Amino acid sequence: MEPVGYVLKVAQQSLRLAMDTAMRDLGVTAPQYAVLGFLDESPGMSGADLARRAFVTPQTMNRIIFNLDEAGMIERAPHAKSGRALNTRLSPAGRRLLRRCRERVDAVENTMLSGLTAAEREQLRDLLQCCVDSLQA
């Protein structure tokens, strides 16, 4: 029997690959999708905040933001208190793209969880959250 941590890593990698495959024709990667989602939840986040939230380096986040900006999916403006930092928001095109991506990611997640009942899905989420809470205590 494989250790739980290993199974979690394989599940995460498999999910990432399935998400990338599902969104490939939209030109969106899983990290770009995550950034679009974060900006939908919390408009105006800085690049540093996005990097922390996405578990990537600031350099990687700068590349993600650059690519999304070049594609017209986000809008950037100087931070009101610090003229140096830039706040980032979804553009209307970014919102439309996020909706399309969410449909595909939801389908991937449904496939991933298709062998579980609704109660088992809830239990899995609760157990994983318990693991996260234990490690962050």
Where on the chain are the PLM-derived regions?
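Residues within helix-turn-helix
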Residues: 47-48, 59, 66, 86
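Charged, amphipathic alpha-helical coiled-coil/dimerization segments
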Residues: 16, 66-129, 136
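Short, locally clustered residues in the helix-turn-helix/winged-helix DNA-binding domain
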Residues: 9-12, 37-41, 102, 129
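Residues within the alpha-helical elements of helix-turn-helix
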Residues: 38, 53, 71
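N-terminal leader segment of winged-helix/HTH proteins
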Residues: 1-26
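Short alpha-helical elements of helix-turn-helix
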Residues: 2-6, 26-37, 62
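Short capping segments at the starts of secondary-structure elements
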Residues: 42-46
